[in-house]
From Swiss-Prot:
Belongs to the IRF family. This is Interferon regulatory factor 5. InterPro entries: Interferon_reg_fac_CS (IPR019817), Interferon_reg_fact_DNA-bd_dom (IPR001346), Interferon_reg_factor-3 (IPR019471), SMAD-like_dom_sf (IPR017855), SMAD_FHA_dom_sf (IPR008984), WH-like_DNA-bd_sf (IPR036388), WH_DNA-bd_sf (IPR036390). Its main location: cytoplasm. It is found in: Cytoplasm; Nucleus. It comes from Mus musculus (Mouse). Phosphorylation of serine and threonine residues by IKBKB in a C-terminal autoinhibitory region, stimulates dimerization, transport into the nucleus, assembly with the coactivator CBP/EP300 and initiation of transcription. 'Lys-63'-linked polyubiquitination by TRAF6 is required for activation. The lineage of its organism: Eukaryota, Metazoa, Chordata, Craniata, Vertebrata. The gene is Irf5. Residues 124-178 are annotated as: Disordered. Residues 14-122 bind DNA. Disruption phenotype: Mice develop normally and no overt phenotype is observed in hematopoietic cell population. However, the induction of pro-inflammatory cytokines, such as interleukin-6 (IL6) and IL12 by various TLR ligands is impaired, whereas interferon-alpha induction is normal. The modification Phosphoserine is found at S157, S300, S430, S434, S436, S439, S445. GO terms for biological process: cellular response to muramyl dipeptide; cellular response to peptidoglycan; cellular response to virus; cytokine-mediated signaling pathway; defense response to virus; inflammatory response; innate immune response; nucleotide-binding oligomerization domain containing 2 signaling pathway. A motif (Nuclear localization signal) lies at residues 12-18. There is a cross-link at K410, K411 (Glycyl lysine isopeptide (Lys-Gly) (interchain with G-Cter in ubiquitin)).
């Protein structure tokens, strides 16, 4: 490693994160940085918050400082020490890299030894020097972002406080409280299943004991299973639409293109996206919406490395107390904006708006997605009557106009919402979905589809069978003359309208 002259900080340099970080874990020179299992797929990083946990006993001998020095962002005796920024830089690098995935985000109740667990992803052989890789570099691009952020505040879209009085359009949600079995309850906060925090206690002088606990959590279930199913799953899903995760929504938060949090919610009524310390209560339904909604808090901006970006992001989060409701009604998805912060969006039901900014009016129910419309367009696409597959992704932009000429990655706060059932159906017919046991998390939803939707699924199933005649594979069970009360999972008319 070449060193610059004394007193002159080295310029930002390209560093291949995966080999560097794996080597640091193997070196065992940083306290607490260690492999979780013998396969060296999961590793543990102590993740202290200086403002909440005080200074570390190990001083500045951390992997965060080492990364800052390796990337040329910190030089001993020249730059002022900034542990918070070092930590944010490494987290951003991990989030941007395709070689790592956050597996477990540690307990949420401020434990004495907070930590994260990352997974090393298998992306084939390591790239050579001439091949593209997920290098991490800091330089001119971030400096340009700083200048752009400095001019941003006057253009942030924040409304004046709403005047007292009834909302423009009333909204209501189903009152029934659906109970889900614990085994089917999805984690809130991460895409992969989250192990029990009580079993994932941080090591305290006994790393061996910590490793003995983890396999008991990690081995069972879909993460450890890689055997392909003995029968094709797709025909069963189309025969029995209630096997599709109709209430599942994938939600991805992004702060200027960096994703601090991705999660899946399965509440049959929907969710509320908000940022506040105030809890929704039954007595404050008019302020925060029904308490039966999944309450999803925006990620903290504390790990944003840029001071200016963090400042402006906080300006918007401060007026997101009441939040944005995503309401599931029948087979449609709606948005109800309660917050003072303006919200703009794009999605399947907004195509007519083109590239012009598309705001969500405050306290007015706005239709975002229709499963019936998606199924009709999917059938037309599969028959070759349309050239493009039906869209299903929904994007929200908070406090800035969208769509416009500015790319989404440059917006302060964006949220992507994906109806999981639509994504699965499209992937089934495009051949993009790998039907291994760990590729789909099946859930049973209430069979509340309308009668004509059953006909749409039967037509999709017929198209699927036609495709399979072109290639040899295990045949699905015969479905001739099938009606809604037949098949391996019979559909009953309970709940249909």
């Amino acid at each position: 490693m070449n060193h610059s002259a004394p007193g002159i900080p080295p310029p930002p340099r390209r560093v291949r994160l995966k080999p560097w970080l794996v080597a640091q874990v193997n070196s065992c020179q940083y306290p607490g940085l260690q492999w979780v299992n013998g396969e060296k797929k999961l590793f543990y990083i102590p993740w202290r918050h200086a403002t909440r946990h005080g200074p570390s006993q190990d001083g500045d001998n951390t992997i965060f400082k080492a990364w800052a020095k390796e990337t040329g962002k910190y030089t001993e005796g020249v730059d002022e020490a900034d542990p918070a920024k070092w930590k944010a830089n490494l987290r951003c690098a991990l989030n941007k890299s395709r070689d790592f995935q956050l597996f477990y985000d540690g307990p949420r109740d401020m434990p004495p030894q907070p930590y994260k667990i990352y997974e090393v992803c298998s992306n084939g052989p390591a790239p050579t020097e001439s091949q593209p890789t997920d290098d991490y570099v800091l330089g001119e691009e971030e400096e340009e972002e700083e200048e752009e952020l400095q001019r941003m505040l006057p253009g942030l879209s924040i409304t004046e406080p709403a005047l007292p009085g009834p909302p423009n359009a009333p909204y209501s949600l189903p009152k029934e409280d659906t109970k889900w079995p614990p085994a089917l309850q999805p984690p809130v906060g991460l895409g992969p299943p989250v192990p029990d925090p009580n079993l994932l206690a941080p090591p305290s002088g006994n790393p061996a004991g910590f490793r003995q606990l983890l396999p008991e959590v990690l081995e069972p279930g879909p993460l450890a299973s890689s055997q392909p199913p003995t029968e094709p799953l797709l025909p069963d899903l189309l025969i029995s639409p209630h096997m599709l995760p109709l209430t599942d929504l994938e939600i991805k938060f992004q702060y200027r293109g960096r994703a601090p949090r991705t999660l899946t919610i399965s509440n049959p009524q929907g969710c509320r996206l908000f940022y506040s310390q105030l809890e929704a209560t039954q007595e404050q339904v008019e302020l925060f919406g029904p308490v039966t909604l999944e309450q999803v808090r925006f990620p903290s901006p504390e790990d944003i490395p840029s001071d200016k970006q963090r400042f402006y992001t906080n300006q918007l989060l401060d007026v997101l107390d009441r939040g944005l409701i995503l309401q599931l009604q029948g087979q449609d998805l709606y948005a109800i904006r309660l917050c003072q912060c303006k919200v703009f969006w794009s999605g399947p039901c907004a195509l007519a708006h083109g590239s012009c900014p598309n705001p969500i009016q405050r306290e007015v129910k706005t239709k975002l997605f229709s499963l019936e419309q998606f199924l009709n367009e999917l059938i037309l696409f599969q028959k070759g009557q349309t050239n493009t597959p039906p869209p299903f992704e929904i994007f929200f932009c908070f406090g800035e106009e969208w769509p416009d000429v500015k790319p989404r990655e440059k917006k302060l706060i964006t949220v992507q919402v994906v109806p999981v059932a639509a994504r699965l159906l499209l992937e089934m017919f495009s051949g993009e979905l790998s039907w291994s046991a760990d590729s789909i998390r099946l859930q049973i939803s209430n069979p509340d589809l309308k009668d004509h939707m059953v006909e749409q699924f039967k037509e999709l199933h017929h198209l699927w069978q036609s495709q399979q005649q072109l290639q040899p594979m295990v045949q699905a069970p015969p479905v001739a003359g099938l009606d809604a009360s037949q098949g391996p999972w019979p559909m009953h008319p309970v709940g249909m309208q």
